[in-house]
């Protein structure tokens, strides 16, 4: 469905992504790496918000730059630390985002109810965003990404700042979405994705280090029995370099 084919990106002559080749189909993909690994850069490229020097990004075999509106209709994105309009109610925020996505005005009330139900936010839609907890705000951002029934969902550090209960709640939301969507979740918190990811992608200083299912990756590293231990091994080695 979505293919990142030999993509490289530089900032001021410093390469931050190195010939990445990643294929995504249905299910949950975890993009793991510390700050500075290139996760947010890759997310911005997938949203067609950032140019790159080499390679291409394909959606169903076609370059995303050529598809334009068709690709955007298939894409839902919740960026890291997106601000909410505190004076808006949750309902008004989702309505505003639906208008930005060119959803038919007659369909918007029904669409707002649909996405709110998916993230268990219906009881709170009339409240102002300023009154929401961190977890509620994050669920609202997930809801706006679901507007228009996109096939591909991108989440950049979706659990940042959430308490353990809110993290678990959001994981349940992601699990419920994976049958009908492709999810790419960028995070440095391994516990957020270890039990739900169908595949894991490790990024290290802009390089693709490994990709595969959790069990498959552990088999490649005898003596390592958890994704968290594998993460620590990879990035402790990075600190020594």
PLM features per residue range, with description:
Residues 55-66, 70-71:
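Conserved ABC transporter NBD signature motif
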Residues 95, 99, 106-124:
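Conserved ABC ATPase "signature" region
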Residues 87, 128-132:
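Conserved ABC ATPase signature
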Residues 153-157:
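Catalytic Walker B motif of ABC-type/P-loop ATPase nucleotide-binding domains
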Residues 47:
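Helix-to-loop junction immediately C-terminal to a conserved catalytic motif
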């Amino acid at each position: 469905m979505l293919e990142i084919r030999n993509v490289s990106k530089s900032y001021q002559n410093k390469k931050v992504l190195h010939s990445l080749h990643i294929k995504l189909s249905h299910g949950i993909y975890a993009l793991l790496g510390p700050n500075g690994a290139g996760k947010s850069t890759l997310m911005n490229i997938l949203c067609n918000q950032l140019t790159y020097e080499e390679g291409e990004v394909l959606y169903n075999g076609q370059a995303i730059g050529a598809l334009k509106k068709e690709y955007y209709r298939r894409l839902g994105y919740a960026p890291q630390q997106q601000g909410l309009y505190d004076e808006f109610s949750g309902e008004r925020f989702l309505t505003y985002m639906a208008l930005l996505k060119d959803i038919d005005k007659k369909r918007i009330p029904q669409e707002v109810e649909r996405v709110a139900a998916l993230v268990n936010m219906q009881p709170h839609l009339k409240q102002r965003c300023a009154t929401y907890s961190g977890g509620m705000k994050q669920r609202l951002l997930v809801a706006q990404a679901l507007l228009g029934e996109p096939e591909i969902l991108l989440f950049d550090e979706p659990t940042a700042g959430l308490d353990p209960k809110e993290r678990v709640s959001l994981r349940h939301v992601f699990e419920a979405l994976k049958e009908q969507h492709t999810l790419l979740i960028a995070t440095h918190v391994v516990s957020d994705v270890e039990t739900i990811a169908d595949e894991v992608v490790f990024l290290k200083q802009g390089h693709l280090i490994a990709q595969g299912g959790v069990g498959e990756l552990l088999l490649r590293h005898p003596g390592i029995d958890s994704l968290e231990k594998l993460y620590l091994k990879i990035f402790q080695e990075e600190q020594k370099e």
